[in-house]
Regions:
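Conserved class I S-adenosyl-L-methionine
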Residues: 9-19, 224-228
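Short, glycine-/aromatic-enriched active-site segment of Class I SAM-dependent methyltransferases
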Residues: 106-131, 135-138, 142
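A short glycine-rich, Lys/Arg-flanked "PGG" loop and its adjoining helix->strand segment in the class I
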Residues: 90-105, 300
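Conserved SAM-binding strand-loop segment of SAM-dependent methyltransferases
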Residues: 51-66, 269-270
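A conserved beta-strand element that flanks and buttresses the S-adenosyl-L-methionine
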Residues: 75-78
Length: 319
């Protein structure tokens, strides 16, 4: 956020789905006027306690117009990790257009469909997501609400995301070459053709078979396998593969609220992380695989007894 303030020098920043105000807190620290729009009342209250002005609303064209009338147009509107959660994309985008100044900027971060498919990240497909965006489809969605996509950045977050930069359609702003370059990559990868999705399904099936074959083989050999992490993506993977305690004895998680509970659908017990060192399993299946570098270092102690880490995606890897 500091980079945005330095580069665009906004006088007023609005964040949609601003949560507890963490991001806008940096804007407040810079002395820039800001406003959060957050539908959750209790979370919005936390933001206000930390000094971030916040209204409790779901964004719509009407809410966007009202906020603009009361607070003025925003030089920058930020919407991170929310665009895929919206059933009414056109209405939400029209709300963004209502908020932003006629010469302003809209910044949206969302998971990139290209990376999801290239790296077989099927476990990041959640029921709470209504859409999965390529740059090509995002450009169309934005245009439907009166915004023109003018630039795109590739980000490593969530296994691969995109930051979309859009401006009011009528401004006629120049479009970065990066937009066309990424769309060309998407087309080459088959994202604009139904056959590409069939190939993705075939790769996902192989990832599933390989993981199950490993777990069954380990069980047959009497080797112990436990999990690390109980993230949302892990629940998708466990349920898709049909992995239950006969193949994965338990998993651990740092969140104390999950201890003593079970993974939904598959009923794998969840314990504190210390359980791994106590039991010294042969293998640890890492469910938040997107944190591979960090967790390989964090779980290096598993090697002390000859244990190994297992990463299921993009393909089975035992290290």
């Amino acid at each position: 956020m500091n980079d945005v303030v330095d580069r665009l020098r906004p006088g007023f920043v609005v964040e949609v789905a601003s949560n507890d105000g963490y991001l806008l807190g940096h804007v407040v620290d810079r002395g820039v006027r800001c406003l959060g729009i957050e539908p959750s009342a209790n979370v919005g209250a936390v933001a206000r306690e930390r000094g971030v002005p916040t209204v409790t609303e779901f964004l719509s064209p009407e809410v966007g117009a009202r906020v603009r009338a009361e607070h003025g147009p925003a030089d920058v509107v930020v919407a991170n990790n929310v665009y895929a959660h919206i059933p009414d994309v056109v209405g939400f985008t029209q709300g963004l257009r209502a908020l932003v100044a006629d010469d302003g900027w809209v910044s949206i971060e969302v998971q990139h469909l290209l990376t999801l498919m290239e790296l077989n990240q099927y476990d990041t497909i959640y029921h709470e997501h209504f859409q999965y965006y390529s740059v090509a489809s995002a450009r169309q969605a934005l245009a439907g609400g009166g915004l023109a996509l003018v630039d795109v950045e590739l980000l490593p977050t969530h296994g691969g995301s995109i930051r979309l930069w859009a401006r009011p359609m009528e401004l006629g702003a120049a479009v970065s070459d990066r937009v066309g370059e990424v769309i060309a990559r998407e087309q080459a990868a088959g994202l604009l053709d139904i056959s590409g999705y069939g190939q993705f399904a075939d790769r996902v099936a192989k990832v599933r078979r390989d993981l199950l074959a490993f777990l069954v083989r380990a069980a047959d050999e009497g080797r112990s396998v436990v999990g690390y992490g109980a993230p949302g993506k892990g629940n998708t993977l466990l349920n898709h593969c049909g992995i239950r305690p006969d193949l994965l004895a338990y998993t651990v998680d740092r969140n104390p609220y999950k201890h003593g509970r079970f993974t939904p659908g598959t009923r794998v017990p969840i314990f504190p992380p210390e359980r791994i060192a106590a039991d010294r399993p042969d293998y640890v299946l890492v469910l938040p695989w997107n944190l591979k570098a960090e967790l390989t270092d964090q779980l290096s102690y598993v090697r002390d007894w000859g244990g190994k880490l297992v990463f299921p995606i993009p393909s089975l890897e035992i290290v």
